[in-house]
Amino acid sequence: MTALSARMLTRSRSLGPGAGPRGCREEPGPLRRREAAAEARKSHSPVKRPRKAQRLRVAYEGSDSEKGEGAEPLKVPVWEPQDWQQQLVNIRAMRNKKDAPVDHLGTEHCYDSSAPPKVRRYQVLLSLMLSSQTKDQVTAGAMQRLRARGLTVDSILQTDDATLGKLIYPVGFWRSKVKYIKQTSAILQQHYGGDIPASVAELVALPGVGPKMAHLAMAVAWGTVSGIAVDTHVHRIANRLRWTKKATKSPEETRAALEEWLPRELWHEINGLLVGFGQQTCLPVHPRCHACLNQALCPAAQGL
């Protein structure tokens, strides 16, 4: 055997089976075998797909050609009470006579309609300040006594506290209200020229004026619907009818909950409607469920 043949034979043996003139595959070594096994395991492991981002559907006003850029998204309520529309129809039917105290003695009926606009607005605000924790009949009586003396910012500031107290008694918390009325009247004279503020934020900054009063003042005095005026009647009835997504503990919580779903065109009506309903039918104690058209629709009817 020649030296060349010997070298070829030795090289062929070192390459192993499959070597030769066409032999270009080597038997995989230990490292290659481990890599191949790892690749095989990867190929059989579950593939993790990237999560798809959730898409929110938004409705737009206008025609199809107007959808997209520049279109304003519609606000669609995510929750509303069950049967609320039928309940509202029934309450309107029960209130169609408009013979509750609020219908004749409420804020809309306490001011002098012949007085100048500025004076009318002041009288509206004053009647609201007196109405807190007070029946409509008592508030109306106090307003009549005040108007008989000429109810203006100047006349109130010229009236001593003792006399003012006698005029507004027996409204609830009359002593505190004497102080608040005097303080608020002084602010109106100094900063608003005897008129009342035209915004909720400025109204609630006045002594003795809360959110319910502010929203009613905006509606009655300025003709602007700024929010739902929620008193104890509206608060109680909204919770009994489950008109709030969860039970609320205060009128302000109730206002925020109602404004989330109740159509804005109903915001002003709902106060007088529910106040009268609460005065006549849905009473705080011993409500007259047997006479209520919503007895079968009211979640609280069975437990009262």
Curated annotation (Swiss-Prot):
SMART domains: ENDO3c, FES. [4Fe-4S] cluster binds at residues 282, 289, 292, 298. Its EC number is 3.2.2.-, 4.2.99.18. It comes from Homo sapiens. GO terms for molecular function: 4 iron, 4 sulfur cluster binding; class I DNA-(apurinic or apyrimidinic site) endonuclease activity; damaged DNA binding; DNA N-glycosylase activity; DNA-(apurinic or apyrimidinic site) endonuclease activity; double-stranded DNA binding; endonuclease activity; metal ion binding. The modification Phosphoserine is found at residues 63, 65. Ubiquitinated by TRIM26; leading to proteasomal degradation. Its cofactor is [4Fe-4S] cluster. It catalyses: 2'-deoxyribonucleotide-(2'-deoxyribose 5'-phosphate)-2'-deoxyribonucleotide-DNA = a 3'-end 2'-deoxyribonucleotide-(2,3-dehydro-2,3-deoxyribose 5'-phosphate)-DNA + a 5'-end 5'-phospho-2'-deoxyribonucleoside-DNA + H(+). Residues 1-72 are annotated as: Disordered. HAMAP family: Endonuclease_III_Nth. APE1 displaces NTHL1 from the N-glycosylase-generated AP site in DNA, thereby increasing the turnover of the DNA N-glycosylase activity. AP lyase activity is stimulated by YBX1. ERCC5/XPG stimulates NTHL1 activity and NTHL1 binding to its DNA substrate. This is Endonuclease III-like protein 1. Changing residue 34 to A: Sorted to both nuclei and mitochondria. Changing residue 34 to D: Sorted to the cytoplasm. Its main location: nucleus. The gene is NTHL1. Residues 191-215 form the HhH domain. Keywords: 4Fe-4S, DNA damage, DNA repair, Glycosidase, Hydrolase, Iron, Iron-sulfur, Lyase, Metal-binding, Mitochondrion, Nucleus, Phosphoprotein, Transit peptide, Ubl conjugation. Residues 43-55 have a biased composition (Basic residues). Pfam families: HHH, HhH-GPD. The record marks 231 as: Important for catalytic activity. It is found in: Nucleus; Mitochondrion.
